[in-house]
């Protein structure tokens, strides 16, 4: 698609310009897509201005001194409450008056497109359109009460005399009064009439009608400041804030329309997350529940610290709890619960999931020892070694050590990655990764460096920082809120995020060393804990500012430099950005200060400030939804190995500074894995892993190719580029970091047309199929014998007398019995494939046939249908006799039965007189033999039967489970002619079901269809498919034979039976040979079968393809993404799909952008906006 594709198609543009004015005004629909009477617009205007009219009445009474200001507020609020209830009652009346089933308003596209037939100004349809009503009765009452309170407080907030006192300017008072009431009317309309669709949308569905409270909540926040200023008159800063906020109050409609102010649910989560991180010293969490629990516990810890009366007790309390709260307590409790379930006999035994932290007794022991050392160090240093800060004090000496540690850790970290600062090639990093063994050997030196870094980071640095804090004299200022907040946070951050805490403490130490003997506010007004808090906030916002500036510059430049991103408007947009650079920069700074995404509208250089939201960016539970498909299984298999590999990568520092909100992209062959860091603590990290689609679209392919180029330049072509080569893809949002070994499946596809089309291979295929099928049948019977040997043999069968020679000839097997009967049977099967053995007279009820039952064969001189053998079941003798009588009555024979009164001779299949007593353990089930097979085909199979191969198979089996000498058992079984005849019958039943009665040389197309299980229909095939177990064995043998044909063509012919056995045993043990669409294929992947093979056909090229998956350790490439670029594109996606509803399949924002990786970023978003095919639950990765 060209670069001039419309951002919104014609239909969506019209839709947008109807929706946006509604958003600005808070809900009134003054622009419709169809003709409407004027009173529709007049009614909405009246409802919109009702709060102003009622508030104006109270304002007049207050200004003329009839009522006091607070009575004025009560008066206006009461009127508004009555009006709100009247409006809602009108809606209820209209809904009851109509007989049609009413569907209440949903915030979706269809609601905006519904058409109404209006009859009158106050008709039912008019009322229902103008006043849609609430979903819940509780909301009807609650929203009306809120509307009344809002109108009353709004009247008080905008009283002219009060405004004149604030500003002392009549013109300013008039402006604020007019536009202030416009803001209140916009907020009231969503409460009493109809809420607007907000550009700031967090949840896709507004189930509980929270959106209606969004605008009133912000109005209440402004009014709260004014009320505080009214009752607290001694705070000049509060009065100044009130004056400023009255002016900002006028611009609330624009802030709502631009989506800068967050929805209430996002605001609460964002507020808790920011407070937990910067005030309480914690980390963003992987779920809303964890955020809430940790927020409450951390806040309780900080409050409790305020009441501790002793400084040593304070140090012990905040130092100990700071360490404990930084541990992964939730995951430890989950693992402990699993262990208790496994050990307790009264609880259901369940083993821990493979993705859970495999916790042993060592970790709690180490943590307990560390806790004791922390308490001992902190208390002793605070009690015995504290002193005022000076250049030579103990705290200053510790600060020097901290500086050395920070520099050392930074150097050791940069040595681990592919690039230094993401720009210069790291000379210590291995330049070529194509040979796994060589790469791992050469990386061993860096692994030793990583161990040293890990020790410094997890043990040395935290204890050094504990010493620094414990020596601070500010801890003696008991019952101080700043000390409790600052030092509780500081002791917690040491363990929660050691690298950031070390950097912040070094900055504070350097500043302290420079200004310790001066009287600047840094020294006088702030204690060490608050200094650390401020530095942490500044550090975080500066890092975000740099990332956002990089993202903005990339969007600006690529809108011109990338040919496919260049639009007709690109020049104008770039010019506007240059001219209004201060405003653009202020937008970037504002988004950094608010920690909100910088939204590039449609990924164009049109920058807006998105609303603040949690680090996870999405409201739903992590990993709760994904677009699952057959390819999902490959990500499920590789995730445990990838988590283990990430453990060492995170701990070594090769992935750079890992903080909550960091994004990484992993690449291996056609797989793209998206990593999001959710939380970070002491020796653990919580991540979410997403798998992107494997069926590559054109846009996906373009970006995946660029990803491959970036990784190849970093890991495969670095040697030719030079030791200190520059990163030529520095502007890309992805920076290559490292490679990690992961045990996963490599995917290889080969063209098999030359093999499957070979006439020699096709002729040999039938003989190989007989051998493979024979091996499969014998092994199946052998396994059954091992599983059933432990069971006692049926007593009746044990005590049964040996049959006579006559019985053996007539009853041992119906097919191998009387030759005359076989010839007669053969005559009726000359046109075998066109007959059915169903009950054509429908005398007996039809049942599902699960096997061949024992039959009654009528012998002697009797009349019957010529050439047929009459049979009947003996399961129910009475029913069968009636059935036989009915049969003769239908046919209409007139001769009397000469054998009437004689006992019917019954013969059972299990009375085969095997020559060996062990043959019964390996016999074929009788329902695996097609009794109607012509004798001619049996004779044909006897000629093709590989007797040497048959005997060789028995020599390879272990018969110790039969409690005899294996050699004796093997010899007896191989010489048992009855057993051999039975296997010949089984082979014939399957072979001719596959290849047909003609037994022609198969074609390549037939071979492909048969591999898929789509053989041409025949009676024998119908019989075979009616026995699922046998059919699966036959299909397995067929596929093994096909794989054998491929291996013989590529590796050479099979020299002897031993080699053939080795091939088949390898197929059986290490391979899954089938179809990639089979459920068994997915199970084999999850069970980690070493090899998988499938056959396919490319209709475009007209060739047959073979696909082989090989499980082995491979190197997965990992790159770090610009987190702000990802958040910005996700924010734009949310705006575009949830507000503009731009569901066009070819919309501009999912087109390929090789620099910003726009298509891949959209895929990685949570459904319904994105479409990852796999998304894991939060995975806890230990970092030790």
From Swiss-Prot:
Which keywords does this Swiss-Prot/TrEMBL entry list? Glycoprotein, Membrane, Transmembrane, Transmembrane helix
User: Does the entry feature the keyword Transcription, yes or no?
Assistant: no
Against InterPro entries, the record matches this protein to: Pecanex (IPR039797), Pecanex_C (IPR007735)
Pfam families (UniProt xref): Pecanex_C
Q: Where does the protein principally reside?
A: membrane
The UniProt entry lists membrane topology as: Multi-pass membrane protein
Compartments reported by the entry: Membrane
TM ranges are: 40-60, 73-93, 141-161, 166-186, 218-238, 244-264, 305-325, 366-386, 391-411, 455-475, 502-522, 573-593
Q: Which positions does UniProt annotate with glycan attachment?
A: 523, 848, 915, 1132, 1159
Annotated spans, Disordered: 788-820
Task: Offer a single GO CC term for the protein.
Answer: membrane
Q: Using the chain's own numbering, where are the disulfide bonds?
A: none
The family assignment reads: Belongs to the pecanex family.
> What protein name applies here?
Pecanex-like protein 4
Species for this entry: Xenopus laevis (African clawed frog)
Question: What is the phylogenetic placement of the source species in the record?
Answer: Eukaryota, Metazoa, Chordata, Craniata, Vertebrata
